[in-house]
UniProtKB/Swiss-Prot annotation:
Active-site positions on this chain: H139, K160, D178 (proton acceptor), R244
The enzyme's E.C. designation: 2.7.11.-, 2.7.4.-
HAMAP family given in the database record: HPr_kinase
UniProt-recorded name of the protein: HPr kinase/phosphorylase
Pfam family, one: Hpr_kinase_C
UniProt function note: Catalyzes the ATP- as well as the pyrophosphate-dependent phosphorylation of a specific serine residue in HPr, a phosphocarrier protein of the phosphoenolpyruvate-dependent sugar phosphotransferase system (PTS). HprK/P also catalyzes the pyrophosphate-producing, inorganic phosphate-dependent dephosphorylation (phosphorolysis) of seryl-phosphorylated HPr (P-Ser-HPr).
Length: 312
């Protein structure tokens, strides 16, 4: 099913002034891309992106003011198609009466903002990308640990929720438990959040459902977080080789993005919350340019080389 946002949603989110065509506020917006219709004002419509929000700034309005009224009306009528969601005017500029007339005839809303064109463009794009981003649901727990979004995955009963509870007690923040909704806002960003019905809730076997915000306060939860790393919990397999140095970096694919992944084997006596906490800190350290595993390997190779030269 194609996701969409209505012009009314955009108007309310950005507090835009409605100039005309209130009945057209339910028109759908299907793309986050915007159009600055400069070439269209000159009569070039071969590649007119009619399905985009049409954004007018100082340049477009000033150019149209130099046109004859009949020509101006003709161009605006050409811009008004069945797929055109809305016209948005920035800087509180005066809206050409020909645009109002053409938009009224086609029942296309004309909106106005006091913001400068560039800033308004950023706000509209960010809002539409967030609302129109593809979404999937994953079984797991998302926790904000030292500013990193850590997605904890694993089979049912492996201890994900219990680990998240311990992390919350250690001062970190819960984003979602059991069902994590992940949306891809752009090519480099995955945002995780919780379905509204289970937001701030944590299920602990033997204890039941608890409300983390009620128990630990508003500082123990957050509504969404960018996913930075995946920690996969699995029952200890004595026949499986686990990385003991940390040179190898696993990846897991979410949508079309490769996310760093750490596999942590679970068995009695291992403090999973501390291990995951340290994994997050170590990941931050790697991003800052220091890799303990690589440093150890380099020091070991230097020592071996030094001993070899001494023996020679």
């Amino acid at each position: 099913m194609t996701k969409s946002v209505t012009v009314k949603d955009l108007k309310e989110r950005l507090n835009l002034e409605l100039i005309c065509s209130e009945t057209g506020l339910e028109r759908p917006i299907l793309t986050s891309d915007l159009s600055r219709p400069g070439l269209e004002l000159t009569g070039f419509f071969s590649y007119y992106p009619e399905d985009r929000v049409q954004l007018f700034g100082m340049t477009e309005i000033s150019f149209s003011e130099g046109m004859e009224p009949e020509e101006r009306l003709k161009r605006y009528k050409q811009m008004c198609t069945k797929r055109t969601p809305a016209f948005v005017i920035s800087r509180n500029l005066e809206v050409p009466k020909e645009l109002v007339a053409a938009a009224k005839e086609a029942d296309i809303p004309v909106l106005r903002s006091r913001l400068k064109t560039t800033r308004l463009s950023v706000y509209i794009t960010n809002y539409l990308e967030s609302r129109l981003a593809p979404v999937i649901s994953m079984h797991g727990v998302l926790v904000d640990i030292y500013g990193l979004g850590v997605l904890i995955t694993g089979s049912s009963g492996v201890g994900k929720s219990e680990t998240a509870l311990e992390l919350v007690k250690r001062g970190h923040r819960l984003v979602a438990d059991d069902n994590v909704e992940i949306r891809q806002e752009d090519e480099m960003t995955l945002i995780g959040s919780s379905p509204a019905i289970i937001e701030h809730l944590l299920e602990i076997r033997g204890l039941g459902i608890i409300n983390v915000m009620t128990l630990f306060g508003a500082g123990a939860v957050r509504s969404s977080k960018k996913i930075t790393i995946v920690v996969h919990l699995e029952n200890w397999d004595p026949d499986k080789h686990y990385d003991r140095v940390g040179l190898d970096q696993e990846k897991t694919k979410i949508f079309d993005m490769d996310i760093p992944k750490i596999t942590v084997p679970v068995r009695p006596g291992r403090n999973l919350s501390v291990i995951i906490e340290v994994a997050a800190m170590n990941f931050r350290l790697k991003n800052m340019g220091y890799n303990a595993a690589e440093q150890f390997t380099q020091d070991l190779n230097n020592l071996i080389g030094h001993n070899s030269s001494m023996n020679d």
